[in-house]
Amino acid sequence: MSTLAIDIGGTKLAAARVDDDLRIRERRELPTPASKTPDALREALKVLVEPLQTTAQRVAIASTGIIREGALLAINPHNLGGLLHFPLVPTLEDLTGLPTLAVNDAQAAAWAEYHALASDVRDMVFITVSTGVGGGVVSDGRLLTGMSGLAGHLGHTLADPQGPVCGCGRRGCVEAIASGRGIAAAAQGSLAGCDARTVFAHAAAGNEQAVRLVQHSAQVVARLIADVKATTDCQQVVIGGSVGLAEGYLAQVRHFLAQEPAVYQVALSAAHYRHDAGLLGAALLAQGDK
């Protein structure tokens, strides 16, 4: 059977026709509509999926935010604008006529990455460091989503009580400091106004401030991993996202994690499926128990 997998992010929408062996047969991308309105998103999704839906038997969605009863929510509702409570599952079922499943994108990515690990790994955590920081937890071979879809939102654990205010309303969340947005917000002087990609480029060129910003992000993520190990006793942590997969970033996380006590050490690896993990994880979930 073929699954129409959809990844809904803050900057782009992706869709792919995925076989049961997780091979992507066809793929399309569009920018996420700048106008955060239900009509704009519905129209963009219609344009995105129309060429792919004719050969699919089901739809699987990996989306930013919290998915609750098929609708789109968020820890920070302002991020969604007019899309708060957008009926994601009913909309795709109406557009395609196919049974539809929806899950948080980091939870979906965790499920894909879990299946890429050795068979003796039953407990793992996926952390994505990108525009924000998210995560997914697999415990004893089962993906944890929680009663309300909140499970795995690791970016909203506390890193620094005196740190910057996070979009969720707390002060000093991991996301507010270690994410691409957090890195950019902390840049000053000649780097003020730079995005995270530019900060990383300056760090590679030896700019001292940029090096410190990237190091601080990696240190905060390493401390998060130590906390995750203490909380879940996971066997493996997988890192993804545009920041997490940036050149040299994982090595820095390893460096800072090695400074934590031995009990908090855990195997680290980069995401096997790279930026397709969300799409493929949603497709896997739609296939049922694996």
Curated annotation (Swiss-Prot):
PROSITE patterns reported for this sequence: ROK (PS01125)
Listed EC numbers: 2.7.1.60
Pfam families, per database record: ROK (PF00480)
Keyword Nucleotide-binding attached: yes
Keyword annotations from UniProtKB, A to Z: ATP-binding, Carbohydrate metabolism, Kinase, Metal-binding, Nucleotide-binding, Transferase, Zinc
Pathway info: Amino-sugar metabolism; N-acetylneuraminate degradation; D-fructose 6-phosphate from N-acetylneuraminate: step 2/5
Keyword match Transcription: no
Positions that bind Zn(2+): 156, 166, 168, 173
GO terms of biological process kind: N-acetylneuraminate catabolic process
Binding site for ATP: 5-12, 132-139
Reactions performed catalytically: an N-acyl-D-mannosamine + ATP = an N-acyl-D-mannosamine 6-phosphate + ADP + H(+)
SUPFAM superfamilies membership: Actin-like ATPase domain
EC supergroup of this enzyme: transferase
InterPro entries xref list: ATPase_NBD, ManNAc_kinase_bac, ROK, ROK_cs
GO molecular function, one term: N-acylmannosamine kinase activity
Function: Catalyzes the phosphorylation of N-acetylmannosamine (ManNAc) to ManNAc-6-P.
UniProt-listed PANTHER family: N-ACETYLMANNOSAMINE KINASE (PTHR18964:SF169), ROK (REPRESSOR, ORF, KINASE) FAMILY (PTHR18964)
Self-association and partners: Homodimer.
Family per record: Belongs to the ROK (NagC/XylR) family. NanK subfamily.
Protein name: N-acetylmannosamine kinase
Organism of origin: Citrobacter koseri (strain ATCC BAA-895 / CDC 4225-83 / SGSC4696)
Record lineage: Bacteria, Pseudomonadati, Pseudomonadota, Gammaproteobacteria, Enterobacterales
